[in-house]
Regions:
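Short alpha-helical segment immediately N-terminal to, or the first helix within
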Residues: 130-134
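DNA-binding alpha-helical recognition surfaces that contact promoter or target DNA
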Residues: 55, 143, 160, 277, ...
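Short, conserved DNA-binding cores of transcription-related domains
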Residues: 2-115
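DNA-recognition alpha helix
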Residues: 139-150
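Conserved beta-strand -> loop -> alpha-helix junction used to position metal-binding or nucleic-acid-contacting
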Residues: 266-273, 278-333
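Residues in the helix-turn-helix
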Residues: 52, 140, 153, 157
Length: 444
């Protein structure tokens, strides 16, 4: 049986973590002094929280401990010792936190320091969720939490901690944008998700499990760019493919968030099928920018390598394969040079030079570059800072975000549910948003 499957066995997992704790950690982490410091920190945290609870009770009653009043106190205003409860913090586990209580009416007492059923206090869970966002698997999260909590949580419990963010995710997806961006980048990324079937099988532990089959789905996503240069992921939606119907549903959701014809100046895409009709229906009249990067990249699919023999002799290339690589590199470089122009007139003039130079040898590639050429210059027709043109004439910003998601998908193999996939998408998007806002604040 593989190591990954044996980790589902609680006894095996406990022994595995004990070995890590005993032999896998540096000596300074296991030293007596380090453990003593840890105990002192936990005791200090416990003292501070208990003092905060005592201050809260004083503010609630308006009377100090042992303070008498002539008319006496009702049970609802009389202290009655304390009870002990467990609390887990980012510093460690507090086994016997003393919480003050009243003789009667404890249900009406609302604590601010800790909530009634709060088991994990402070940013401890947030830190582990961020670890998952940064690339830790659920088993990595399980091991990290075991070192903090001193006990082992099941994989299902770790998964519930991550999925707890799903409520925030749903609220974010339905919340209208406070300030809709003038530039919207849209694209799709294919993901692998496991879906349950009607079959039931028994695992190695004899437990009955629903059989899942992996299926391909596309995550449609939208990224907004503002004139100050910062950008954010605004919306995403799982679909079976990039069709007119799925894009219509996607832009309908964006419209409800406040992305309308009045707020949007430009939509940037890579020419996905079905996108044009959805744009005409929901954002009629809005300029549509075709991604320049994809436009140039696709030229390689239309190369016919005409007159390669003469070119091969000119460069003294020893092989046809090397000559083809040189041809591809040269024509892509020239296509990129076309879009280096600073104005529309300059770019069109460069396009004519490109056509004259390559028409005889690569007619299909030249025709593909000039097809819908006006759509690749749509970014020049709107009122937006030219210094930010590189951000709005391609979908590279969105592709960069997709790269992070692909890395995570490679780590985990496939997502076990649509909810898990969307939750990770939300976590990564919020992380990128925080980085963008921090960078914006530093520039102000």
């Amino acid at each position: 049986m593989s190591h990954a499957k044996q980790l589902h066995n609680r006894r095996y997992l406990n022994d595995y973590l004990e070995i890590i704790n005993r032999e896998g950690l540096p000596g300074n982490v296991k030293s007596d002094l380090c453990l003593q410091v840890q105990d002192t920190v936990i005791a200090t945290v416990q003292h501070v929280i208990e003092e905060a609870l005592a201050e809260e009770l004083y503010a609630y009653l308006g009377l100090a401990r042992y303070e008498h009043v002539p008319w006496g106190r009702p049970p609802e205003s009389t202290r009655s010792g304390s009870y002990q409860r467990e609390l887990i913090t980012q510093y460690g586990r507090i086994a016997d936190l003393r919480v003050p209580k009243l003789r009667r009416g404890n249900g009406a007492l609302t604590w601010q320091s800790i909530t009634r059923y709060e088991h994990c206090w402070g940013p401890m869970l947030d830190q582990h969720v961020m670890g998952y966002c940064l690339g830790h698997s659920l088993r990595d999260l399980q091991e990290a939490m075991a070192l903090t909590l001193g006990e082992v949580l099941s994989l299902a419990a770790c998964n519930r901690i991550v999925l707890r963010v799903s409520k925030q995710m749903e609220a974010f997806k339905q919340q209208p944008l406070a300030s809709p961006p003038p530039i919207v980048l849209v694209d799709g990324m294919w993901v692998t998700i496991a879906y349950p079937t009607d079959e039931i099988s028994a695992d190695s532990q004899g437990r009955r499990r629903a059989v899942k089959r992996k299926q391909k789905r596309v995550m449609l996503s939208a990224l907004g760019v503002w004139p100050d240069g910062h950008w954010e992921i605004m919306h995403w939606q799982i679909a079976e493919g990039e069709t007119a119907d799925t894009w219509n549903a996607f832009f309908r959701a964006l419209y409800l968030k406040g992305v309308t014809e009045q707020t949007t100046d430009l939509v940037v895409s890579d020419g996905s099928p079905g996108l044009e009709s959805a744009l005409d229906y929901h954002l009629y009249g809005v300029a549509h920018q075709r991604c320049i990067f994809h436009k140039i990249k696709q030229l390689a699919d239309y190369l016919v390598f005409g007159a390669l023999e003469g070119e091969e002799a000119a460069v003294e290339a020893p092989s046809t394969r090397k000559a083809k690589q040189q041809r591809k590199k040269a024509i892509l470089a020239d296509a990129g040079w076309v879009y280096d122009g600073e104005s529309e007139a300059d770019i069109r003039a460069r396009a004519e030079v490109f056509r004259d130079h390559w028409q005889a040898r690569e007619p299909k590639a030249v025709a593909n570059l000039l097809l819908d050429f006006d759509k690749t210059l749509a970014y020049l027709t709107i009122d937006f800072p030219l210094s930010l043109a590189s951000l709005i004439r391609t979908t590279n910003l969105l592709e960069r975000f997709h790269k992070e998601m692909r890395r995570k998908q490679r780590d985990i193999g496939m997502f076990q549910s649509e909810q898990g996939c969307e939750t990770l998408w939300y976590l990564l998007s919020r992380r990128e948003t925080a980085k963008q806002r921090a960078a914006l604040s530093s520039r102000l």
